């Protein structure tokens, strides 16, 4: 029954939506996409039975306890923060996808200011209390310095451009 199962995302072009677009492509599944304006409205819609499934981050779902059931996470293996949740990979779908978060500054920022910011961010990422707070929010950290993060973003951009050419997501919303 292609297109009969409805899934929600936190909006067109968001990380949650793109992960579901990849899921559809990798599995040959056709789902009916309903975009929402964020995690709160999407959670309410799932709990209210208005959509059957949703693409969301662990941090948006895990605090709900037993009200929502996480079926899979888009990682190579199980998260240490949610070890009972199987990965797509272990269920036969090689879907590995993460949400990127970072700090940026204007290109004209002086080198000494960039250096101080990088040092401060490195210290924050290494701080055990900060790491504990991130874990409490079900957010796994993968700290990368500027050049490494830029390289990851450039690779992701190329992958998204390819995805866009084969599956434009504006056409994917019904």
State where each predicted segment sits.
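An extracytoplasmic/periplasmic, membrane-proximal ligand-sensing/linker region
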Residues: 26-29, 111-174
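Conserved functional loop/turn residues at catalytic and ligand-binding sites
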Residues: 35, 49-50, 67, 92, ...
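Short, hydrophobic alpha-helical packing/hinge segments within bilobed ligand-binding/sensory domains
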Residues: 42-43, 61
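Hinge/capping helix and adjacent helix->loop/strand transition within the periplasmic-binding protein
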Residues: 1-37, 41, 88, 93, ...
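Short loop/turn segments at beta->alpha junctions
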Residues: 35-38, 57, 145
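A ligand-binding cleft/hinge motif common to bilobed small-molecule-binding domains
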Residues: 17, 22-26, 48, 53-83
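Residue-level detector of flexible, active-site-proximal loop/helix-junction positions
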Residues: 14, 38-40, 75-77, 141, ...
